[in-house]
Structures are given as C-alpha cells and as structure tokens.
C-alpha cells in the first residue's frame, strides 16, 4: 500500500511514466529457460500496484530483436496510456518492422 501511495504522489505531477520494458533486447524464444524467473523486466512494479501500463516497440538491437518502451499511467486512466502509445507509434516507424521469428 505504501508503494501505491508513493506512486500516486508521483502521478499527481505527470501524465505518464516512460521506462524501458526490459534490460536490453527481448530474449530469444529458444533462450528462455522454463521456470526461470524473468528478473530483467521493469513491468512488475506497475503490475504489483495495479497501474495501467503497456509496452510498445521503440527500436531493434543489432541482431534484430525488439526493444520495448513501457508507458504507465494513473490508476484507472488507461485512455491516456493508449493515447500516448498511439502518438508515439504515429511519430516513429518501429511498429512497421517485424523481428525475426
């Protein structure tokens, strides 16, 4: 509850928080170890607090794997999160490119 109160205080000053989704490019599917914790992500804090957040592509690594940009908003304000993501995608070409499968 304390974390959520601190988050709400920050959100009084900004519309959204933008962070990387992950500490680097996406993990290749064949490199994922079943049952291993996914500790390199930054999504947990928003999930833990029940805050709306989404991840969109913001580029690609040198080997073609996607880089994620996370946008998080105020409690129950999914609309702003989606609008910011939509504006970013309209301003950049990343959503048009596909990673190797």
Question: Locations of the language-model features?
Answer:
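Serine-dependent amide/ester hydrolase catalytic core
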Residues: 1-48, 96-101
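Structural helix-boundary/capping segments
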Residues: 2, 48-101
């Amino acid at each position: 509850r304390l974390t959520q109160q601190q988050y709400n205080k920050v959100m009084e000053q900004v519309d959204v928080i933008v962070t990387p989704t992950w500490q680097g490019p996406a993990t290749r599917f064949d490199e994922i170890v079943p049952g291993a914790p996914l500790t390199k992500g930054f999504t947990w804090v928003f999930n833990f607090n029940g805050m709306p957040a989404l991840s969109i592509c913001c580029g690609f690594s040198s080997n073609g794997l996607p880089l994620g940009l996370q946008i998080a908003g105020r409690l129950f304000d999914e609309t702003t999160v989606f609008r910011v993501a939509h504006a970013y995608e309209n301003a950049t070409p990343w959503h048009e490119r596909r990673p190797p499968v």
